[in-house]
C-alpha cells in the first residue's frame, strides 16, 4: 500500500520514528541500527515501508533502503517469524552479516539476536538459504569478512539513550554524539563517547 514515505523527521527513538508529511505524522517502527544513521529532527527523510495488517492493528515498518525492506518482507515469511522478530534480526545484523550467517549455517551468530534460539536459527537457515541467494541484493562474493556485531553502531545507540535519559532532547543528543564521534578513534568505547559528547551539549 505504501512503497515509501518522504517528509520531515519529527521524532525518533531506538524503535520508532515519526515522519511529518504535510502536517500528517506517520508512525513507523524501525530497526535499532538506524538510530545513528537518521538525520536530525526537522530535516528531510525518506523511509521505504512495509504495511502490515493484523486483526487488531495496522502497522508501518520503515527502512532507509529498499534492500532492507525486501529482506524484512522475506524474513516475515519464514515459519514462526513475525514482524517483531524480523525487525530484531535486521536491527542486530547487517544484510551481509545475515546472508553470511545463513550461507555458513552459523547458528551462534543468529542466536546472538534477542529472541532467536537454536530452533529458530536452524529454521532461518533452512528457509532463507535459497531466497537470499536468489534476490541478488546482497554480496555473494567469496571475499567474506569475519562475522561480528557492529560495536560502533551499538555504542552510538547506547550513548544516544544515555543522553536522552540525562534529560537532553534528541536533536541535542544526536548533534553531540556526531561531534564526539569525530574526535574519537575508529574503535569507540561507550564511556568515552558519552564523556566526549557531554562536552558538546
From Swiss-Prot:
Residues 144-153 are annotated as: Flexible linker. Residues 153-201 are annotated as: Domain III. Gene3D superfamilies: 5' to 3' exonuclease, C-terminal subdomain, DNA helicase RuvA subunit, C-terminal domain, Nucleic acid-binding proteins. Residues 65-143 are annotated as: Domain II. It comes from the Bacteria. InterPro entries: DNA_helicase_Holl-junc_RuvA_I (IPR013849), Hlx-hairpin-Hlx_DNA-bd_motif (IPR003583), NA-bd_OB-fold (IPR012340), RuvA (IPR000085), RuvA_2-like (IPR010994), RuvA_C (IPR011114), RuvA_C_sf (IPR036267). GO terms for biological process: DNA recombination; DNA repair. Its main location: cytoplasm. Keywords: Cytoplasm, DNA damage, DNA recombination, DNA repair, DNA-binding. Residues 1-64 are annotated as: Domain I. The keyword Cytoplasm applies. Signal peptide: none annotated. It is found in: Cytoplasm. SMART domains: HhH1. The keyword Lipid metabolism does not apply. GO terms for molecular function: ATP binding; four-way junction DNA binding; four-way junction helicase activity. GO terms for cellular component: cytoplasm; Holliday junction helicase complex; Holliday junction resolvase complex. Homotetramer. Forms an RuvA(8)-RuvB(12)-Holliday junction (HJ) complex. HJ DNA is sandwiched between 2 RuvA tetramers; dsDNA enters through RuvA and exits via RuvB. An RuvB hexamer assembles on each DNA strand where it exits the tetramer. Each RuvB hexamer is contacted by two RuvA subunits (via domain III) on 2 adjacent RuvB subunits; this complex drives branch migration. In the full resolvosome a probable DNA-RuvA(4)-RuvB(12)-RuvC(2) complex forms which resolves the HJ. The RuvA-RuvB-RuvC complex processes Holliday junction (HJ) DNA during genetic recombination and DNA repair, while the RuvA-RuvB complex plays an important role in the rescue of blocked DNA replication forks via replication fork reversal (RFR). RuvA specifically binds to HJ cruciform DNA, conferring on it an open structure. The RuvB hexamer acts as an ATP-dependent pump, pulling dsDNA into and through the RuvAB complex. HJ branch migration allows RuvC to scan DNA until it finds its consensus sequence, where it cleaves and resolves the cruciform DNA. Has three domains with a flexible linker between the domains II and III and assumes an 'L' shape. Domain III is highly mobile and contacts RuvB. Belongs to the RuvA family. This is Holliday junction branch migration complex subunit RuvA. It comes from Protochlamydia amoebophila (strain UWE25). The gene is ruvA.
Amino acid at each position: 500500500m505504501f512503497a515509501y514515505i518522504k517528509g520531515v523527521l519529527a521524532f525518533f527513538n531506538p524503535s520508532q520514528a515519526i515522519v511529518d508529511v504535510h502536517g500528517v505524522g506517520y508512525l513507523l517502527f524501525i530497526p535499532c541500527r538506524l538510530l545513528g544513521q537518521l538525520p536530525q529532527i526537522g530535516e528531510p527523510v525518506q523511509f521505504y515501508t512495509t504495511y502490515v495488517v493484523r486483526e487488531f492493528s495496522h502497522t508501518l515498518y520503515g527502512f532507509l533502503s529498499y534492500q532492507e525492506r525486501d529482506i524484512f518482507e522475506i524474513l516475515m515469511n519464514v515459519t514462526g517469524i513475525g514482524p517483531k522478530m524480523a525487525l530484531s534480526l535486521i536491527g542486530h545484523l547487517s544484510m551481509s552479516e545475515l546472508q553470511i550467517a545463513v550461507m555458513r549455517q552459523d547458528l551462534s551468530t543468529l542466536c546472538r539476536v534477542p529472541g532467536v534460539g537454536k530452533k529458530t536459527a536452524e529454521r532461518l537457515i533452512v528457509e532463507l538459504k535459497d531466497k537470499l541467494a536468489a534476490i541478488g541484493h546482497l554480496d555473494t562474493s567469496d571475499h567474506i569478512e569475519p562475522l561480528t556485531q557492529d560495536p560502533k553502531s551499538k555504542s552510538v545507540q547506547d550513548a544516544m539513550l544515555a543522553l536522552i535519559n540525562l534529560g537532553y532532547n534528541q536533536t541535542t543528543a544526536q548533534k553531540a554524539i556526531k561531534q564526539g564521534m569525530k574526535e574519537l578513534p575508529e574503535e569507540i568505547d561507550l564511556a568515552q563517547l558519552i564523556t566526549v559528547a557531554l562536552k558538546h551539549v
